[in-house]
Design a protein with these regions (language model features):
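Mid-domain Rossmann-like dinucleotide-binding core that forms the NAD(H)/NADP(H) cofactor-binding site
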Residues: 1-85
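A generic alpha-to-beta junction signature in SAM-dependent methyltransferases
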Residues: 15, 42-43, 97, 121-123
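Glycine- and other small-residue-rich loops at beta-strand/loop junctions that grip anionic moieties
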Residues: 23-27, 51-52, 81-83, 103-108, ...
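Short, well-ordered alpha-helical microsegments
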Residues: 31, 59, 114-116, 166
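C-terminal hydrophobic helical "lid"/dimerization subdomain
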Residues: 70, 86-92, 116-120, 124, ...
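A short acidic, Gly/Pro-enriched loop at the edge of an enzyme's catalytic core
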Residues: 87-105
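C-terminal substrate-binding/catalytic core of Rossmann-like NAD(P)-dependent dehydrogenases/reductases
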Residues: 90-95, 136-171
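ADP-ribose/adenylate-binding Rossmann-like module
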Residues: 104-111, 120-141, 154-155
Length: 171
């Protein structure tokens, strides 16, 4: 992800240190790796880290592997949310953020509802990282362009990686 400051065109690369982060559809293999990476970083971490999915068994497994207690010992408030069992996932996730939305949102499934939820929970200068590569060349999802213009929200895609990425993730 990246962030900006109003009046400046300089991009601050990476998640917002001490910010609010959400990982949607985040308990598959790549999501588990992401949770591990976020919880073990020494240089930068969110204060709030919300991980969602619609599969309770997978959420339970993630919560066993990466406990709230371990996250708390690292200064991170970790929450697991089954968005398939709440009436309004966007409202629930925004409430968890304290109503401000999230600084960094990662969408880990090429599913229209996931991407649209990601867009709808962004806070000011929020970055949506579309990590999951769709195979459908016609894949689309709605985006609030009012928020892009007036709220400085932005979307980026992540695909592949390089040797430096692998070395960093293994540290």
């Amino acid at each position: 992800c990246y962030h900006t400051h109003q009046g400046s065109y300089v991009h601050q690369m990476d998640i917002k240190d001490g910010g609010k982060m959400a990982l949607l559809a985040g308990v598959g293999p790549m999501g588990l790796a992401m949770i591990n990476y976020v919880l073990r970083r020494e240089d930068r971490k969110p204060s709030l880290f919300v991980v969602t999915d619609i599969d309770q068994a997978r959420l339970d497994r993630a919560a066993t592997l990466y406990t709230k207690e371990f996250a708390a010992s690292r200064g991170i408030d970790l929450r697991y949310v089954n968005t398939g069992t709440v009436e309004n996932p966007v409202e629930t996730l925004r409430e968890i953020s304290g109503g401000t939305g999230y600084d960094d949102v990662f969408a880990f499934a090429p599913v229209k509802q996931v991407v649209e939820q990601a867009d709808q929970i962004l806070g000011r200068d929020g970055c949506l990282n579309f990590f999951a590569g769709p195979t459908d060349t016609q894949f689309t999802a709605a985006c609030n362009f009012y928020n892009v213009h007036y709220g400085s929200t932005h979307i980026m895609g992540t695909t592949g990686g390089n040797t430096d990425d692998m070395v960093e993730s293994l540290r």
